[in-house]
UniProtKB/Swiss-Prot annotation:
GO terms under biological process: cellular response to oxidative stress
Organism phylogeny: Bacteria, Bacillati, Bacillota, Bacilli, Lactobacillales
Reactions this protein catalyses: 2 glutathione + H2O2 = glutathione disulfide + 2 H2O
SUPFAM superfamilies noted in UniProt: Thioredoxin-like
Gene3D superfamilies in the record: Glutaredoxin (3.40.30.10)
Family membership: Belongs to the glutathione peroxidase family.
Domain of life: Bacteria
InterPro entries referenced in this protein's UniProt entry, alphabetically: Glutathione_peroxidase, GPX_AS, GPX_CS, Thioredoxin-like_sf, Thioredoxin_domain
Name the UniProt record assigns to this protein: Glutathione peroxidase
C-alpha cells in the first residue's frame, strides 16, 4: 500500500483518488473550525497560493474527535473555511483520524510516519508531508506553523 492507493470524499461528495496527486508534493492535515490552531488555515492557504504552481497540494480533512471542535455539517465547515480564511485548497468530508473507525488514509499515514511523532494523532492540525513519489517524509505537530514547514516543502518541489 502507498499514499496513492487511497481515496476520500470531497465536500461536494465527489470521490477523489490520491493517485490524482501523483507527481505532486502533498500536505495532508486534519482540521477543525473551533480550535486554537484554526488560524493555521491562513498559513496553509498562503503556502498553497505560493507553491501550487510548483506542484504543492494541500488536502484538508475536518475531524471532530478532539473536544468536538468541528461539530458542524460538512457544508458549514466548507463555508466557514472559505468565508473566514479564503481556503481554496481541497477540503474533504469530515473523517475520524483515530480509533477503529479511522479513515484508511490516516491509518496509513500514522503507520508510515517515523520518529517521535508517530502513532496516534494527538490534536487538530497535525500535518503530514508527502513527496512526489507518495512517500510520507515528515509529520509535523499541531503547534508547528505552516510557515515553519516551508524549507522542507521547498526541498521537495
Amino acid at each position: 500500500m502507498n499514499f496513492y492507493d487511497f481515496s476520500a470524499f470531497k465536500m461536494n461528495g465527489e470521490t477523489v483518488s490520491m493517485s490524482d496527486f501523483k507527481g505532486k508534493v502533498v500536505i495532508v492535515v486534519n482540521t477543525a473550525s473551533k480550535c486554537g490552531f484554526t488560524p493555521q488555515f491562513e498559513g496553509l492557504e498562503k503556502l498553497y497560493e505560493n507553491y501550487k504552481d510548483q506542484g504543492l497540494e494541500i488536502l484538508g480533512f475536518p475531524c471532530n474527535q478532539f473536544v468536538n471542535q468541528d461539530a458542524g455539517e460538512n457544508s458549514e465547515i466548507n463555508e466557514f473555511c472559505q468565508l473566514n480564511y479564503g481556503v481554496t485548497f481541497p477540503m474533504f468530508q469530515k473523517i475520524k483520524v483515530n480509533g477503529k473507525e479511522a479513515h484508511p488514509l490516516y491509518q496509513f499515514l500514522k503507520k508510515e510516519a517515523k520518529g517521535a511523532l508517530s502513532g496516534t494523532i494527538k490534536w487538530n492540525f497535525t500535518k503530514f508531508l508527502i513527496d512526489r513519489e507518495g512517500n510520507v517524509i515528515e509529520r509535523f505537530a499541531p503547534k508547528t506553523e505552516p510557515k515553519e514547514m516551508e524549507e522542507e516543502i521547498q526541498k521537495l518541489l
